[in-house]
Amino acid sequence: YELIAEINHPNIVRIYDLGVGDDHAHIAMEYLDGGDLKQRIAEGITERNAVSYLKQIASALAEIHGVGILHRDLKPGNIMLRKDESIALIDFGLAKRLRLRMEMTDEGEIFGTPYYMSPEQGHGNGVDHRSDIYSLGVIFYEMLTGEKPFRAGSAMAIIYQHARAPIPLLPTRVSQYQALLNMMLAKQPEDRLQSATEVPEWL
């Protein structure tokens, strides 16, 4: 979080203070009063707002990628809104973790279900900034349609779909974004957009 605290960007949560005690750590950060993107998707997002949010998230990713930080857990619940409709990226806790863990209860309920994971992340392979771009593509699809592009009954089935299933087609009303979506959701990192800065160029 130290690097994040040094970043001054409108689409990244502002961190005012960091501290570590003998048995605890504390973070004082900006109060975000507009709810999260997960809630907003459930309510329904206009095409105009979906594109605006996409640009803002891409701008935040470009900023953190530029200083060598990967988010690794990009999902609607980690994207907050302010009252003025601006986006703030939060929860960089996974940025320091080298391994992704999925926990499962005795009943088989999955925590951290990999709806937003890139194929390489889902398979436990090395990731770079292009993995975050893939996750953003999943979120963009969900903002435009209200549905996740890949759904299944188990984590492994979702991971398989990310790696093998065709990229779903957007509804006709928003089909003009299909080319961008294809470039974000390409299975191989080298076939994707190579930088978050490229996103606005496709809009």
Regions found by a protein language model. Give the residues of each.
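AlphaC helix of the eukaryotic protein kinase fold
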Residues: 1-6
